[in-house]
Every structure is written in C-alpha cells, then in structure tokens.
Design a protein with these regions (language model features):
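Zn-dependent metallopeptidase/amidohydrolase metal-coordination segment
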Residues: 123-181, 185-189, 196
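Long, hydrophobic, amphipathic alpha-helical segments used as structural scaffolds
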Residues: 85, 190-193
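Midchain, well-structured core segments that form catalytic/ion-binding scaffolds
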Residues: 1-109, 113-115, 126-135
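Residue-level recognition of short, well-ordered coil/turn positions
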Residues: 30, 193-194
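Short glycine/serine- and small hydrophobic-enriched flexible loop segments
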Residues: 17-24, 183-191
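Acyltransferase
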Residues: 118-122
Length: 196
C-alpha cells in the first residue's frame, strides 16, 4: 500500500461501496423490509491493499415477491460497487432462503378460541414478523405460528430480558397453556371441526 497502491485493487473498498449502496436503498423500501450485513473479511494488515474482502447479509421482507425485488436491487448495487473499484464480484447463498409465513386462518381462529377456553383473554390476531423456515412449511401445508406472552412487560426477541423471562413461573404457565391450546386445536382438526 505504501510503495505502489495504484497497482492494487482494494476489495475492501468494493465492500464498503456495497454497504453504502444498500444503506442508500433503505430509504426506498417498504417498512416490512430488513437488511442486515457484516464484513467477515476485510484484509490482513493496514499496510497491504486488501485483495479479498467478504460480507454476509440477511434480507427480509413481508412477501417473497418483495424480497425478490430487493435481492435484484442488491445484486445491481454489488455489480456497481465492483465496477466502481475494479474488483471481481462473487455472490453465493450461505443459507437457504425462508419464504414468508402464510397463516392458515381457520387454524388460527380455532387456536385463539382454545386459548380463550383456557382463560387467555388478551388475544391478538396473526402477527407475521421476522423470518423462519416455518414460512417454507406454510406454503406446503396449513400452518400457524402462535406467540404467547411470557412477561407482563414488552420483550424484544433474542435479548437477555427475553432469556430471563423464559425461566419464570409465568413463562412455564404460558408454555403449558400454549401446549394445551395446540393439542385442543389438533383435536379440532381430527374431529373435523376445522376446514383445512
């Protein structure tokens, strides 16, 4: 980097431009879109032009169609970043994608009725957030993905507060209630009380 930087192609610059482009894209996406990224390799020493740099990203959206549109835009941003810096671009998936969750309304309604029968009163309709492979399942068969509150305070998933809440008496009580509601919903299916 000191003697002839003009002869090097800085792969880290390409990654930085990719992040800048994705950051600019954020103002043009719908509220359901989430874009997360991290640089996993950016060079080996400050005095050496990085000849290789890598990053990993997660892209999420409310529907597969929106996600496909976002991914196409991101691919173009990556191509532009490589073109701007003279770098070579390689893209690959490091995990299988997750489809959006399609909640089966009849199953969801039956589950909510079973919760009410078990004494849970504060019930909200289907809430489809985050991403999980249960979305892929929901495109093949009737699916619900219920949540039950395990705290009297709002919690954020994947947090220390959430982890601590899982070992409380309320959490254990709600786990049992949820399991019973699922079992009763399964009985409703077996007894043909729900149209799938």
């Amino acid at each position: 980097a000191a003697s002839c930087p003009h002869e090097g192609i800085n792969a880290l610059n390409a990654i930085i431009q990719l992040f800048n482009g994705i950051d600019a894209l954020r103002q043009h996406v719908t509220p359901d879109v989430r874009m997360h990224g991290v640089i996993t390799q950016g060079g080996v020493a400050a005095n050496i032009v990085p000849d290789e740099a890598t990053a990993q990203f997660y892209f999420r959206a409310g529907t597969k169609e929106t996600l496909d549109d976002i991914l196409e835009k991101v691919k173009n941003i990556a191509k532009g970043a490589a073109l701007m810096t003279g770098a070579t671009l390689e893209m690959s998936r490091y995990e299988l994608p997750n489809d959006n969750l399609k909640t089966h309304e009849n199953l969801s309604s039956a589950f909510m009725e079973n919760l009410k029968a078990l004494g849970i009163e504060d019930i909200h309709g289907p809430k489809e957030t985050g991403s999980s492979d249960i979305g892929n399942v929901s495109h093949k068969t009737a699916t619900i993905h219920p949540y039950l509150s395990i705290s009297n305070c709002p919690l954020t998933g994947h947090s220390v507060q959430m982890a601590n809440a899982t070992i409380t008496d309320l959490a254990h009580e709600r786990l049992l209630t949820g399991a019973l509601a699922l079992a009763f919903t399964g009985l409703d299916v077996l007894n043909k009380k729900i149209e799938l």
